[in-house]
A protein has these predicted regions:
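Serine-dependent carboxylesterase/thioesterase catalytic core
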Residues: 48, 65, 71, 97-99, ...
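Short, solvent-exposed loop/turn segments at secondary-structure junctions
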Residues: 50-52, 78-79, 136, 160-162, ...
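Short aromatic-enriched loop/helix-cap "lid" or pocket-rim segments at secondary-structure transitions
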Residues: 58, 83-88, 165-170, 207-213
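Glycine-rich "HGGG/HGxG" loop immediately N-terminal to the catalytic nucleophile
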Residues: 77-94, 140, 165
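C-terminal catalytic-base region of ester-bond hydrolases, centering on the histidine
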Residues: 193-288
Length: 288
């Protein structure tokens, strides 16, 4: 773009006259080829999960780039998540009826910035949102309030997308009502009118009790599952139960043996963005 802008800078007539026509034509062809090349690389915007930062997704973004996509990760640093503490000042937090806005307005702004950046850098007119963990429900809020004109598809990775069940003993809604609001007020996949794919990992089954050392991990994970879906014996990716990561009306996919997060992932504990796992769902990103 800078080189093209230089060509448009006012120049004395005599200097313009010395530029051969074939050079101008060649420059135009090169610009057209560059634009076509950019447009042929679909733009992906990766949305970090709760507690994560942009750099956590460097390897994932590089893998997407190697497969022909233009990847942009929304700019988030870990201290940004402290902004969510603003919700504590809202009486609805304590009532369990908290709404996502204005508490997560800062994150919605980061999505908007990343979408604009991706479009400008790739030459693509729309992007696919790939939302990890809590980024999934925040993507739903974004699409509901900002619209879908700039977005061609949404893919969520282990995102909690359903309201926490009420009336289950020992269960406290960790979102303080936000997921209930999202479920009741945000557009469904059918209403959005764009492809929505929800990926869930089936890495570890939770346990309701500890019957031995081998059950300890399942018990600890199960207590987390219970706070999200009401069932400690559910299957999930270690953080999000399968049932919570799937959304009515979406293309719901369960990935066997997949862990929740890039932090702590390995060949033995692959997450959604591990190359071998990405092989299993990358076609969901190739939408018209």
């Amino acid at each position: 773009m800078l080189a093209h802008a230089t060509l448009l800078r006012p120049t004395p007539l005599s200097a313009r006259a010395r530029v051969p026509a074939r050079r101008v034509a060649s420059s135009r062809r090169a610009s057209a080829r560059a634009a076509a090349s950019a447009a042929s690389r679909p733009a992906i915007v990766v949305l970090p999960g709760l507690g994560n930062c942009t750099e956590d997704y460097d390897d994932f973004a590089a893998e997407l780039e190697s497969r022909g996509f233009h990847a942009t990760v929304a700019r988030v640093i870990r201290p940004d998540w402290l902004r969510n503490a603003a919700g504590l000042a809202d009486i609805n937090y304590w009532r369990g009826t908290l709404e996502p806005r204005p508490t997560v307005d800062w994150y919605l702004g980061r999505i908007a910035d990343a979408v604009a950046e991706a479009k400008a850098a790739s030459g693509d007119d729309r992007v696919t949102l790939v939302a990890h963990s809590a980024g999934g429900w925040m993507a739903r809020v974004y699409l509901n309030d900002y619209g879908v004109d700039d977005v061609r598809a949404l893919v969520s990775l282990g995102s909690p997308l359903n309201a926490v069940p009420k009336g289950v003993p020992g269960v406290v809604d960790q979102t303080r009502g936000i997921l209930t609001y999202v479920e009741a007020n945000c557009a469904t996949p059918a209403q959005l009118g764009i492809p929505v794919t929800c990926l869930a990992g089936r890495w570890l089954e939770g346990r309701e009790s500890v019957e031995g050392v081998r059950d300890a991990a399942g018990f600890l994970v199960g207590q987390g599952y219970k706070q999200v879906c009401g069932d400690a014996a559910a299957w999930g990716d270690g953080i999000t139960p399968v049932a919570t990561a799937h959304l009515d009306g979406a293309d719901n996919v369960t990935l066997e043996g997949v862990f929740h997060t890039p932090l702590g992932s390995s060949d033995d504990r692959p997450w959604y963005g591990t190359p071998a796992v990405l092989d299993r769902w990358v076609e969901k990103l190739r939408v018209a």
